[in-house]
Amino acid sequence: MNTLDFVDEKSLRSDVPDFRPGDTLNVHVKVIEGSKERIQVFKGVVIRRQGGGIRETFTVRKVSFGVGVERTFPVHSPNIDHIDVVTRGDVRRAKLYYLRDLRGKAAKIKEKR
């Protein structure tokens, strides 16, 4: 193990649920506005998960008022309050970039039984 791995190990979160691309998540993010802090929920489909260790990130996509919105979060970020898995998706790809081009029912992901 490298020296950096020992340093990174202290920053890893233990409360991260098991999720994969295709799953629908509620990501509760801490937002600081002035001197106030509040929790904002970002609900969407995981389209990718990449990296490893402290550098691991995932991207969540949702359609808000007809506009596609994607947000990339570090898995072990202190700005994430917690992550809820809403549904499990049944997909055959690790990166779901093709969802960007689909509209309506075509962009729907089958739920895993």
UniProtKB/Swiss-Prot annotation:
GO terms for biological process: translation. GO terms for molecular function: structural constituent of ribosome. Gene3D superfamilies: 2.30.30.790. One of its GO terms (cellular component) is cytosolic large ribosomal subunit. Keywords: Ribonucleoprotein, Ribosomal protein. Coiled coil: none annotated. It holds the Pfam family Ribosomal_L19. SUPFAM superfamilies: Translation proteins SH3-like domain (SSF50104). Belongs to the bacterial ribosomal protein bL19 family. This protein is located at the 30S-50S ribosomal subunit interface and may play a role in the structure and function of the aminoacyl-tRNA binding site. This is Large ribosomal subunit protein bL19. The gene is rplS.
